[in-house]
């Protein structure tokens, strides 16, 4: 059983036969070792009790009822009780029935079996280590081809290495006739010695090749070959050969380099984790505890349903027992080879049904659900039962756009915020002596008085929250934000951060989590804030960019009459085409423009003259000064030069008195926002310098 206080991580990997025995075997108080499943039976058809040494045996996996043995006795009942921990009649220990959730068993295979995950899956680790293709390995694995292995300094029949077709009928007559003329072969069972010493097939053939691997030598040789390929590639580049043949050769070199890199990584992983490659060939097959593969009766006397894993285990045990009997009786070689192939197929179906072609099916033509089907997918053990569980201090709601938010802020509904931060609010209320005890603080929170919202806002100021949108495919799928209380029930989000979440505002939901510890809050503040994650982790391009809605809004707010100063006396964007004075209003500052807009004296697209604070025209005109369109003289001798985009007022001597630029309310507002943003960034970068006002 996994105890929370002792285990802090879970690693999935290959297990050695010794480790499988340690998981499965246990020593009873009488010294008997149990753990091996030898019978294909599950429950007795009359008593519905587990069969002895079967896949539900109580001696192996523990009692069905806590502290009650298979005989029905308990430690306090019965005169034949010798030990309070053990029943001498049935051999069942008096322990808690929860042991059946984690106590495993094992099947001792009569022949080694290759683990199909490491053979058929991509990439094929066995094929990678042995530097062969999967098709070359499938022949020996499924007993279609045989591996010749001449032994040095010993009498041998075969002089070849590698795989070959072993025809049973042709060799059955040749080998005994050959051995009868050579009495030094007759110390054993004739052709049996030849087959055991010089021919291998099935899991034996693959296991022997994996056992003889030197991982460090594989790394060194692969690295040397990779360097040679790199030098060959550079030589081709220097020769500037671009023919079709050379392109094919370059592609072959690239594929070979990728293969070598993968092989080096795999060998280094085996060395780093102290895993032996031969463990990819199974000699002992673990049997899952009974709880993950239950047998359930539907009602009293009703139909009994069983997990598909039980049927797949039954097939493995039946075929394994058949092969054991054949080997014990020295059965026909063709039968033995055929049975080895059947065991390999049965184990393949148990681990991953259908990976080798047509899956095994039940009487209703439904494919059996294998171990891979149980653990993979959205409804598998990991995602359904282990991941995605409900956690404390978390919530979930629909996201909507928050145009008033900064990039690092998110709008948190008050209903969600008061639940997430309730513990912090209670502590603050009691610490400030606003509430005398816990009950009074909870009562104040239920009443939702004004003081509660004030305390909540103070608590949220220094406490970031994490927003997560499933599926979390990269690190930007979960980011930290500073929460802001908002009305309603939807989480408000800045539109520019949607790129990292791959989210939009068409009904997407997000989960919100509250980091509790000081370390988690510091990590969220320093590493996970949205304003510090502006670049894509995959390609490095900006990922927090203006959305299409923002760009369209900016375009609409800053659009002006295409005719400019030459427009007619009717405003082109006015809905009723009302006439207005040709004399455009003049304003001294941004505030005057926005004040007039709020008072509805002008609209968003009204052309106006705004006084320009700088007398340097280089930032609004070209190098060559354009001629004025119109010159207006005043009675005191001053005059106005009207240009297309600006107006200059000059004195009698030609000196510049002031400058007005032609713009609109929308452009004025946009320019002010940009100026404040740049000014704030400049002050943040150079806090000790007084920067002049920026004009855009």
UniProtKB/Swiss-Prot annotation:
Cofactor note text: Binds 1 Mg(2+) ion per subunit. Binds 1 Zn(2+) ion per subunit.
So where does Mg(2+) get bound?
A: 504, 506, 508
User: Record's family?
Assistant: Belongs to the RNA polymerase beta' chain family. RpoC1 subfamily.
Its annotated function is as follows:
DNA-dependent RNA polymerase catalyzes the transcription of DNA into RNA using the four ribonucleoside triphosphates as substrates.
Residues that hold Zn(2+) according to the record: 69, 71, 87, 90
In the UniProt record, what gene is named as encoding this protein?
rpoC1
Quaternary structure note: In plastids the minimal PEP RNA polymerase catalytic core is composed of four subunits: alpha, beta, beta', and beta''. When a (nuclear-encoded) sigma factor is associated with the core the holoenzyme is formed, which can initiate transcription.
Question: Which InterPro entries is this protein grouped with?
Answer: DNA-dir_RpoC_beta_prime (IPR045867), RNA_pol_asu (IPR000722), RNA_pol_N (IPR006592), RNA_pol_Rpb1_1 (IPR007080), RNA_pol_Rpb1_3 (IPR007066), RNA_pol_Rpb1_3_sf (IPR042102), RNA_pol_Rpb1_clamp_domain (IPR044893), RNApol_RpoC1 (IPR034678)
Q: What is its EC number?
A: 2.7.7.6
An annotated Gene Ontology molecular function: magnesium ion binding
> What is the designated name of this protein?
DNA-directed RNA polymerase subunit beta'
Q: Which BP terms does GO give this entry?
A: DNA-templated transcription
| Gene Ontology cellular-component terms listed | chloroplast; DNA-directed RNA polymerase complex; mitochondrion
Q: Which UniProt keywords apply?
A: Chloroplast, DNA-directed RNA polymerase, Magnesium, Metal-binding, Nucleotidyltransferase, Plastid, Transcription, Transferase, Zinc
Question: What is the reaction catalyzed?
Answer: RNA(n) + a ribonucleoside 5'-triphosphate = RNA(n+1) + diphosphate
Q: Where in the cell is it found?
A: Plastid, Chloroplast
Cofactors: Mg(2+); Zn(2+)
* Primary enzyme class: transferase
Species of the source:
Pinus koraiensis (Korean pine)
- PANTHER family the record matches: DNA-DIRECTED RNA POLYMERASE, DNA-DIRECTED RNA POLYMERASE SUBUNIT BETA
């Amino acid at each position: 059983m996994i105890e929370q206080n002792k285990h802090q991580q879970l690693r999935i990997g290959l297990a050695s036969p010794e480790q499988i025995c340690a998981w499965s075997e246990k020593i009873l108080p009488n010294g008997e070792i149990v753990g091996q499943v030898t019978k294909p039976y599950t429950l007795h058809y009359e008593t519905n009790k587990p069969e002895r040494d079967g896949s539900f045996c109580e001696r192996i996996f523990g009692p069905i009822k806590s502290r009650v043995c298979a005989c029905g006795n308990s430690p306090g009942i019965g005169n034949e009780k010798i030990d309070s921990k053990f029943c001498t009649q049935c051999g069942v220990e008096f322990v808690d029935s929860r042991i059946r959730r984690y106590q495993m068993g094992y099947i001792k295979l009569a022949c080694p079996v290759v683990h199909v995950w490491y053979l058929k899956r991509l990439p094929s680790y066995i094929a990678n280590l042995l530097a062969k293709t999967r098709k070359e390995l499938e022949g020996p694995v499924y007993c279609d081809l045989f591996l010749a292995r001449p032994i040095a300094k010993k009498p041998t029949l075969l002089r070849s290495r590698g795989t070959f077709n072993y025809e049973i009928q042709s060799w059955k007559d040749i080998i005994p006739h050959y051995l009868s003329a050579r009495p030094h072969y007759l110390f054993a069972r004739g052709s049996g010695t030849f087959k055991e010493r010089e021919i291998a097939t099935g899991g034996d053939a693959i296991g022997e090749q994996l056992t003889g691997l030197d991982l460090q030598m594989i790394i060194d040789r692969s690295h040397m070959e990779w360097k040679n390929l790199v030098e060959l590639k550079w030589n081709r580049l220097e020769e500037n050969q671009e023919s079709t043949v050379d392109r094919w050769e370059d592609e072959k070199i690239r594929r070979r380099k990728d293969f070598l890199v993968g092989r080096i990584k795999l060998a280094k992983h085996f060395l780093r984790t102290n895993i032996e490659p031969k463990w990819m060939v199974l000699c002992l097959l673990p049997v899952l505890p009974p709880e993950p593969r239950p047998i359930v009766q539907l009602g009293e006397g009703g139909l009994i349903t069983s997990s598909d894993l039980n049927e797949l285990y039954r097939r493995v045990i039946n075929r394994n027992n058949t092969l054991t009997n054949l080997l014990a009786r020295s059965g026909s070689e063709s039968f033995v080879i055929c049975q080895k192939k059947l065991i390999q197929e049965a184990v393949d179906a148990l681990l991953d049904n259908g990976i080798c072609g047509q899956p095994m099916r039940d009487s209703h033509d439904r494919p059996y659900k294998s171990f891979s089907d149980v653990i993979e997918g959205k409804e598998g053990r990991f995602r359904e039962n282990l991941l995605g569980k409900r956690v404390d201090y978390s919530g979930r709601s629909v996201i909507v756009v928050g145009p008033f938010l900064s990039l690092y802020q998110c709008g948190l509904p008050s209903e969600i915020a008061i639940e997430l931060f309730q513990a912090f609010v209670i502590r603050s209320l009691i610490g400030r002596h606003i509430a005398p005890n816990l009950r009074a603080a909870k009562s104040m929170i239920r009443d939702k008085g004004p003081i509660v919202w004030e305390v909540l806002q103070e608590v949220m100021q220094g406490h970031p929250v994490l927003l997560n949108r499933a599926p979390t495919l990269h690190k930007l799928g979960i980011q930290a934000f500073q929460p802001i209380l908002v009305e309603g029930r939807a989480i408000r989000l800045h539109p520019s951060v949607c790129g990292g979440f791959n989210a939009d505002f068409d009904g997407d939901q997000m989960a919100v989590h509250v980091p509790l510890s000081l370390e988690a809050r510091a990590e969220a503040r320093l590493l996970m804030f949205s304003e510090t994650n502006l670049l894509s982790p995959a390609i490095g391009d900006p990922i927090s960019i203006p959305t299409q809605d923002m760009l369209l809004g900016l375009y609409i707010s800053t659009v002006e009459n295409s005719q400019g100063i030459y427009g007619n006396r009717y405003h082109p964007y006015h809905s009723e085409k009302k006439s207005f004075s040709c004399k455009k209003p003049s304003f001294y500052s941004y505030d005057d423009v926005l004040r007039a807009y709020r008072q509805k004296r002008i609209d968003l697209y009204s052309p106006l003259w705004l006084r320009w604070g700088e007398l340097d025209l280089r930032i609004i005109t070209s190098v060559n000064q354009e001629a004025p369109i119109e010159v207006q003289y005043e009675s005191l001798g001053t005059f106005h030069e009207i240009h297309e985009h600006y107006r200059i007022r000059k004195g009698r001597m030609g000196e510049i008195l002031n400058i007005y630029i032609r713009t609109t309310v929308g452009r004025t507002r946009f320019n002010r926002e940009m100026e404040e943003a740049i000014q704030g960034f400049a002050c943040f970068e150079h806090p000790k310098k007084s920067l002049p006002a920026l004009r855009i």
